[in-house]
Amino acid sequence: MKLIDLDGRVIEVENLDLALLQADDYRHYRVTTPTENDIYRYAYWEDVYQKLLKLKTEQL
């Protein structure tokens, strides 16, 4: 399975369940004073997580 991230890069997903767990962890990381890069990272991991969920529902 593949998905395209916010930067337009193709990501190959070999283990969808593990990828969902990892992306879910990353999307919940927060810092007390987020920089512009941190805010982008929040959006990035939320986007990846949502795309992985879509892949999961398409599998069912």
Residue ranges, per PLM feature:
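N-terminal acidic leader/helix
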Residues: 1-32
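Short, charge-rich amphipathic interface segments used for partner binding and complex assembly
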Residues: 24-60
